[in-house]
Amino acid sequence: VLTGDFNIKPDNRNLKELDKIMHSTRKIALKTDNHNTFNGWGKAKKDNVIDFIYVSGFSSCPEYRTVTKKYSDRTYVSDHYPIIARLIF
């Protein structure tokens, strides 16, 4: 499992190299979403997916999701949304 804020978009050539040896859970999950992963404290442009979970050696990924929950005392708890992947080994 390789996860993190890569600060590059999915079409970046470096990620294309990683795609040769690992799988993006956002792409392979049976259930997924299309939310941004970077919110920039509400100032980010659309189409900002720069956080990833890559895997190899798992039999499936039933679910990937971006947690975009809002809180009553603050809209954002970080400038990035958490991402979650459920994996079956």
Segments from the language model and where they lie:
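Metal-dependent phosphoester-hydrolase catalytic domains
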Residues: F6-F89
